Amino acid sequence: MAGVFSYESSEVDWCEDNYKHSENVVEYFNTMSSFIFFVISPIMLYLLHPYAKERNLAVHLVWIMMVFVGIFSMYFHMTLSFMGQMLDELSILWVLAIGYSLWFPRKHFPSFVKDRTSFARLVLTITIISTLSSFVKPTANAYALNCFAIHILYSLFVELKSCTDERVLRLAWASIGLWVLAISCWISDRFGCSFWQKLDFCYLHGIWHILIVMATAYASTLIAYLDASQEIPYSLPDLQYWPRNNWAIGLPYIVLKGTNTTRKTC
Ligand SMILES: CCCCCCCC/C=C\CCCCCCCC(=O)N[C@@H](CO)[C@H](O)/C=C/CCCCCCCCCCCCC
Ligand SMILES: [Ca+2]
Ligand SMILES: [Zn+2]
């Protein structure tokens, strides 16, 4: 049992050289880059609070769980232990489960599901089964998790096919662009390590951490905005960027322009 906590007990080892900067931290840059989770999560919790208050406070679970993903990611890269790998991957699975339960469009629910509560129960059941199955072939977990991004991309494509709103489309393209950059780094670190070692640049997995957190901030805000437009249209949701709306780079969030003024009564 103690073996699962041992350093390097995971079968996964990223391109970064082990113990290069510290004898206690296996992958130093990969560990430190996970700090981005602790920077972005509190900001997103703060920015999404008005939307969460109006829609459902459970929305906050997404970014609260992202803090745990950050903790487990740090622990995993610090030790490369089997326990670290499983905690890292299972926390991502549970963030996805929360996201699907909250935001998967009602109109695409399977016909036997009558409301969002039943849908959330179905997601919970599938997630518990997936959690148990993840121990069968742990090296396959990361690939399975990455497939969810493909499904999210497909769902966004279906939702935005007929959208002409410039701000929404801009956010969609930014989310997709960030994800493409992120997954290119992840794949390149996984499969192109000998090439990157020749260039003495083995930091792509750390860069992936930064890009995937940004992609999650962008894509989850877009999905939450589409959800708000359908579920709480009376609150007149709109998109803005923090810290300045007119800056090219910023964190997207939802403002509710109609709360308390135009709320429907029936
Ligand atoms: C209608 C559905 C709405 C769901 C929205 C919720 C989206 C957020 C989901 C997940 C958060 C991703 C957190 C990534 C943490 C990375 C930690 C890490 O690096 N782990 C690696 C090991 O250190 C491991 O190998 C990585 C495994 C793969 C993770 C795949 C995550 C899927 C990301 C989905 C992002 C959405 C982007 C959408 C693009 C338009
Ligand atoms: Ca390594
Ligand atoms: Zn990682």
Swiss-Prot record:
It catalyses: an N-acylsphing-4-enine + H2O = sphing-4-enine + a fatty acid; N-tetracosanoyl-sphing-4-enine + H2O = tetracosanoate + sphing-4-enine; an N-acylsphinganine + H2O = sphinganine + a fatty acid; N-(9Z-octadecenoyl)-sphing-4-enine + H2O = sphing-4-enine + (9Z)-octadecenoate. InterPro entries: ACER. Residues 49-56, 105-116, 161-167, 227-266 are cytoplasmic. It comes from Danio rerio. Endoplasmic reticulum ceramidase that catalyzes the hydrolysis of ceramides into sphingosine and free fatty acids at alkaline pH. Ceramides, sphingosine, and its phosphorylated form sphingosine-1-phosphate are bioactive lipids that mediate cellular signaling pathways regulating several biological processes including cell proliferation, apoptosis and differentiation. May also hydrolyze dihydroceramides to produce dihydrosphingosine. PANTHER family: ALKALINE CERAMIDASE (PTHR46139), ALKALINE CERAMIDASE 1 (PTHR46139:SF2). This is Alkaline ceramidase 1. It comes from the Eukaryota. Its EC number is 3.5.1.-, 3.5.1.23. One of its GO terms (cellular component) is endoplasmic reticulum.
